[in-house]
Amino acid sequence: MWKKRELFIGLIAFVILFYAVYSTYGTPLTRQTVYGPYPGTISANQLDFTWVAGSIEAATPTTFACTGNELLLFHNNGVQAYTTTITSVADEYNRTGDITAYSIGAGEFAAFKFTNVAGWRNSSGLVSFIVENASVDVAILDISR
């Protein structure tokens, strides 16, 4: 009886901890490498990148580790316009500048380059954003090469 109770309590603690971490940092997005200008021999699919659906939940935004060498891409593959919001943080002068409800038309693409982390990267080293609808796919490209 005690073993089951301890296991249950442990499981509940794990779920609470997982939720706390997940809701704090959101849905992580993996940076993808862009090759060039002299990449050497390129193999099949090496220049491809992957789109994923962005998070629509403000409580669990999509996040990525920002180094100052990223290009954030959006593709609205829906049939109507949808928006995205990129959350800023206070810079050294206490200024913020969220990109709020930026509209991306049906079938359109949008991009934002993060070459300066001030005002965007939070204390955990992450940038966060949400999309209005799961029809908006996102990709983060590492442009440091």
What are these regions (language model features)?
Residues 1-28:
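Sec-dependent, cleavable N-terminal signal peptides
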Residues 24-40:
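Predominantly extracellular/luminal regions of secreted and cell-surface proteins
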Residues 31, 120-145:
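Terminal connector regions
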Residues 41-67, 83-85:
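Surface-exposed ligand/attachment interfaces on beta-rich extracellular proteins
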Residues 66, 73-78:
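Asparagine-centered strand-capping/turn motif at beta-strand->loop junctions
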Residues 70, 80-85, 136-139:
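Short beta-strand/loop motifs in extracellular/secreted proteins, especially
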Residues 79-95:
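Short, surface-exposed beta-strand/strand-loop-strand elements in extracellular ectodomains
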Residues 93-124:
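Intrinsically disordered, low-complexity Pro/Gly/Ser/Thr-rich segments with frequent PxxP/GP/PP motifs
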